[in-house]
Structures are given as C-alpha cells and as structure tokens.
Amino acid sequence: MVYGVIFGANSYEHEISIVSAVVLKKVLKAQKKFIFCDKNKEFFLIDEEKMNAKTFSSGAYKKEKALVLKQGGFFIKTMLGEKKLDMDVAVNIVHGKDGEDGKIAALLDFYGIKYIGPRIEASVLSFNKALTKLYAQSVGVKTLDYKVLNLHKEQNVSLSFPCILKPARLGSSIGISIVKDESELKYAKDVAFEFDEDVVVEQFVSNIKEYNLAGCMIGEKMEFSIIEEPRKNEILDFEQKYLGFSESSKVSEANISEELKQKLRDNFTRIYNPLFKGALIRCDFFVIDDEVYLNEINPNPGSLANYLFEDFTNIVDNLAKNIELEKQIKIDYAFIHSINGQKGKL
C-alpha cells in the first residue's frame, strides 16, 4: 500500500499540518509519498528525506517536483510530459480551511481518487462548530448550551459568565478566549472576529472532565483508540495542544470505569456512523455528573491521532483497504439520441 499524504494548504493551521506530516513520516510504517499544497494551492512532491521544517520555512520546497491533479491521481510534470504518481490511497491531513471544510474532499472525489478523510458532507458539518452542535443533537449526543454571534449583527451574550468564545470555523485553540466578566467581553469578541465572522459562545465549566477518543469504521466494525484524559488546564493554548502530538510517543489510557468507557464509545459511534465513513476522526468529550457531552469533532486530527492507537499502521492499512470509490453514473446520451431520432437535430 502506497499512501499519498496531502498536507499544507492555505489555512491558519498550515504549519500544524506540516508538523502532522512530519510525524506521519515516523509513525506510519508504510510506503509514503508526501504531497505538499502551498499557500498558493500549488502541489509539490516532497522527498521523504527533505520532510523537515526548514524545507518549508525556507521556501526550498519550490525546488521539488511540481504535481498536477487530474482524473485518477496526481501527475508529475516532466520534460517528456506527465507521469502518474505511484499512489494507492491519499491521506488528507490538511488542518483547518481547505482540508477540513470539504475542498480537498471535493477535489479527490471529483478526480476519482481513493482517500482517507472526511467526505464533503462530514467536512461541512464538522468544520463549523455551530453546525456540529446541531448535528450532534440530531443523533442524540448532548452539547453544552451555546449561542452564535455574527460580526454583522448586534447581539447580546445571553449566557452567564464565565463563558468561552470560539471562532466557528477554526481549530487548534486559535482565537479562543475565556471571558470571566463583562469587562473582558469586547476584547474577546474582537479577537474571535479577527478569524471568523461567526463566533460560538459556550458556558465555561471549571474543573470539567475531558476525554479524547479516536476511531474509524472498518467494514461494519467500529475500531476505537484508547481513551485519553488530557492534562488539566483552563484551556490548552496553541503550543500546548500541538507540541503534544508532535511527539510520536503514546499516551496513557484514562483511568475510568467500564461504564463510562462504553458511554464514550456509544456517543462516538452515533457521531461517526455513517457520516464519517472513510475517515479516522477524534472526538473530544466533556463529562458532567456522569453525562457525556460533545466538545468538538476533529475530522483530520493532528498526526491522525496516532498516539492513541496501539497498532496505528494496522488500523490505517485496514481502513484504506475498505475504502471504495463513488459509483460511476452511466451516461449514454440515450435521451438526446431519442430526441434527435424523432424531431431532428437539437
């Protein structure tokens, strides 16, 4: 199995995606091709030996082979024309805009390329935090109370303090603020609106229990990772959140009851099946008074949440083997031929 790891793109989380790709170089024990999408949305084939931070920060990637996306795959530009890149399955690890909003999924679907990652509908619903909450509630998964603010509308925050403000279409803890009283609200709104015209406001619950669970469906069976309890802090900032997954070491499993473990898995399955088939996702949950609440869905989790799996490569291989392309629609122009036959040419 040869994987084409797609990363980068024009996103606030561009650099995080590069870190994810570098980690996958270490932990995915399979043949890999690294496909970098730069800020101008040009594709480059990066030699595995050059998969390091300097290649991208210095702009040296521009000296690598350029790729074009066409029906059936990526193609390398050569002096004699184009040569198809040897790749069986693409892996979408573009974080944020372009990768998690459905654009990459749409391209890969359109050009008939097998890929691991959320499909278009799953991307749209999980990229927008407000839509995520509506989706979760529709499948019987609880969420915290929330309100959506829009940059172009005058709206009051009806939730009591403290509350938390999050840009609706951004991950990685970027633009997030905890607001403890009215005096901090305007600044927090200004920060969040710098990144998105829609902002989700939630009640902030201190000393809350948080658990992370990753998984995917292989055939008709759900495969789950261990359950992680992140280290406690009011909120993980950008560096805390992503320096953690930049390491390839495993994490310890949360010390929780079998009953709670099953509750988390049940809620994960409701979120995942069938919308996220073909993707390996991570869900972050809150637990309050033994009740499970969805915090967020990570459709392309950092480094594919490899650190949560005992045998990460085996999970990815089995997921890839079960991915099917969309069925092609038969187009034979029978209708047009029938019109031409009866009434002359159109």
Curated annotation (Swiss-Prot):
Free-text cofactor note: Binds 2 magnesium or manganese ions per subunit.
Residue ranges the record marks as coiled coil: none
Protein name: D-alanine--D-alanine ligase
Localization (cell): Cytoplasm
Binding site for Mg(2+) 2: 296, 298
Gene Ontology terms describing biological process: cell wall organization; peptidoglycan biosynthetic process; regulation of cell shape
The protein's enzyme class: ligase
Residues reported to bind Mg(2+) 1: 284, 296
Gene name of the encoded protein: ddl
